[in-house]
Amino acid sequence: MKKRFIKDRLNHQCSIGKQGKCCKNCLLGPCIVLNRQDKGACGASQDLVVSRNILRFTAGGASAHCGHAYHTLKYLKKDYPFDYIKKKAPSYLYNLWKKHGFLPKAKLEHFKDISEALHTTTMGTNADYKDVIKWCLRLGILDGYYGLYLATELEDQVFGKPEVRVGELNLGVIQPNKINIAVHGHEPILAEALIKEVRKKENLDINLIGVCCTGQAVLARHGIPMAANFLLQENVIATGMIEAMVVDVQCIMPSISDLAECYHTKIITTNELCKMPNAVHMPITNKKEAEEVAHKIISMARTMGRHRLKNKRIRENKKVAVVGFHERNLPYSPKEIADKIRKAQLKGVIAVVGCDNIRVKEDWVKLYKELSKDYLFLTTGCIGFKLANAGLLDGKNFYHLGSCVNNARIAEVFRLIAKAAKKQIHDMPFLISCPQPISEKAISIGMFFAALGVDVHFGYNFLLSSDMHIAKYLEEALKKTFKSKVFLEMKPKQFKRRLQKEGLSTIYK
Ligand code: MSK
């Protein structure tokens, strides 16, 4: 029954929208621009329609990451740091971005830039697709610093830096003889308060588990076992052993509130932005509220535990993975990595990031495993969970750097290695590989790395197919300004062939 339910949902994909060739920015449409010569009712070209769709996607992603940092600042009662991008970015890049008009105009203007990006894509505003593409890069930079960097830095300051440890993961971490509480989403504020509660000796009957990026964050910082990535969140509830699923923001499937109705599970929403039918809404805005809500959740979960059906069992085994790396605790220093690259002992660094998209059937994990003989691998997000499940996160060739916002750690690793090599980032053999994107956030993260001068691979069409004129334009524009490339390669074999033939530093430059 559940399988059919999911299959039916997957059948609802629009093949035209998938390529970005549908404009629904006004009510003269929606208009389809299947061919290059097609125009929308207002005269918008295919290039304009596709570029506007990409920008709206990027704006969605940037708003999520910048919102994450903003919520954390508000929670901590802190102000935005002054001149943040200037402080964090390499100076040559800061000057380049400034020269080409990619920086927010003033303090706090980054949210205005996201809003202006939406404005520029409304019907009858910007008709220059080249300028629309420029906006994508601008929002990528905002996402990188006012989202990824700031959220990571604040959380590290308050909740501590991760530590290298062996973590447990998979549905097997759910304990049949305990009250199971899952924390799910991206902003681990309440999850941190729950950890403190759960570690009190009167709460030894509680088993706290993580899902999605909140799960990655608490796994890396505290060793809280991780039950599932985005793709498996429904399976967590379907075990029938979850008393409460506590969600914050982003990547929380609306389906879970329906699914929870079939079990005894209580869904608890904890952020003003995220409400769900049939859920208990307990928003938190400060530390005191977080502590009180954490306390209430535990007693609510215990009550729900009385309704759990008897004799439930978990069939899946636990997996283990080495987690908890960050930019300063990799086994090799930036200088050692730079030297290995210079001496050709290492062909480069590949960061595998992003989601785990069920529509992608190709076996990227197998390819990464093969390539790890020659390349050092970093990973974050849901795809990191997939690599862990395949047994690759042994702390030798693959290094797990946390959640989606922790892509800031990858940017830092790249910056530090390039600095140690006395080169600019675009001179180094670095690659971002996002084989299975789902969320808009994967696209804005990609735009950020492209603006840093790192090549970005997507393994799934993101409103763009490689034969389109706009894809070629994006390629050229990036090459000219940032010496980087965003490219699509859906076939692992083809990807490997290109990599082996020419290597990272030359093929994609
Ligand atoms: S949770 S953005 S499905 S990685 Fe960060 Fe996973 Fe992608 Fe959400």
For every predicted segment, state its role.
Residues 2-509:
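Anaerobic metallocofactor- and corrinoid-dependent redox/one-carbon enzyme cores
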